[in-house]
């Protein structure tokens, strides 16, 4: 059992609050501890542990969160009750729901398929006047990151209008601060869309991690959790923020004061 922590008046008020709560402070100031103690307070208030969902972003952070909750709760609650608390990454939460609902088969596309599809598309279209080594080491990773980024907003290749995208590029492009010319960027934009299409086609019926979040958002028909707690909430993208709000009756978010804070309606 962890040593009793002396909380400030403000920390105690945060943990005792029954309202949607956002805790923002500098890194290393005990936000995850606050989240863990909030879970313990919910258990003390007789909240069903199965009605508590804790979300973080990596398997390592998930284990650390469980360990902290277990240590603070040891001696107060049974191991069985603590084990009933739902602790997930966003992806494992979406995966488990979709799998249990029979929406996916369990096959998840890995990173290698995306990289191969991007490279294959560039080669087939004889895209970009660069050496293959440079394309593999620099262009493919940038394309991969760009696909993941726009997909996090629910933008699939069929929703991208090349003419509109080109017009926007011309308006925002600053040649002085870019390593590429406007013509190179226009060519890349065209081939980027083709590579994105090639990747989606190559997956066939399989899904990747971004697909899982999109599918969860569209297919979720389950009951809301009474309490949803999110660690490192500044790392949430738009879809993850929507998922957190759609599955929660009450939200408790903790994060660093370095990025935009999400607003919640209601």
What does each model-found stretch correspond to?
Residues 48-51, 83, 249-250, 256-257:
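Short glycine-/polar-rich loops that comprise or flank the Walker A/P-loop
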Residues 1-24, 29, 33-34, 51-53, ...:
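Accessory N-terminal region flanking or inserted into the helicase ATPase core
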Residues 29-31, 234-266:
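Conserved helicase motor core of SF1/SF2 NTP-dependent helicases
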Residues 30-37, 59, 64:
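Phosphate-binding Walker
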Residues 13, 41-45, 72, 218-219:
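A generic secondary-structure signal
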Residues 51-146:
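Conserved P-loop NTPase-based nucleic-acid remodeling module centered on helicase motor cores
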């Amino acid at each position: 059992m962890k040593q009793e922590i002396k909380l400030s008046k403000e920390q105690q008020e945060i943990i005792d609050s029954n309202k949607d709560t956002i805790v923002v402070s500098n890194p290393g100031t005990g936000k995850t501890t606050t989240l863990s103690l909030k879970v313990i307070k919910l258990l003390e208030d007789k909240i069903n542990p199965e009605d508590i969902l804790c979300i973080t972003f990596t398997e390592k952070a998930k284990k650390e969160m469980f360990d902290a909750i277990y240590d603070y709760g040891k001696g107060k609650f049974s191991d069985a009750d603590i084990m009933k608390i739902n602790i997930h990454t966003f992806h494992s939460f979406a995966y488990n729901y979709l799998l249990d609902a029979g929406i996916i088969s369990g096959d998840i596309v890995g990173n290698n398929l995306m990289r191969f599809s991007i490279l294959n598309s560039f080669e087939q279209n004889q895209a970009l006047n660069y050496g293959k080594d440079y394309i593999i080491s620099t262009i493919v990773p940038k394309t991969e990151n760009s696909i993941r980024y726009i997909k996090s907003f629910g933008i699939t290749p069929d929703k991208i209008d090349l003419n509109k995208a080109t017009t926007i590029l011309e308006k925002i492009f600053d040649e002085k601060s870019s390593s590429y010319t406007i013509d190179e960027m226009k060519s890349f934009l065209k081939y980027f869309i083709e590579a994105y299409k090639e990747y989606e086609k190559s997956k066939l019926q399989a899904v990747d991690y971004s697909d899982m979040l999109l599918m969860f958002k569209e297919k979720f028909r389950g009951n809301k959790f009474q309490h949803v707690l999110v660690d490192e909430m500044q790392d949430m993208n738009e879809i993850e923020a929507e998922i957190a709000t759609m599955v929660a009756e009450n939200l408790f978010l903790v994060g660093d004061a370095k990025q935009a804070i999400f607003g919640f309606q209601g």
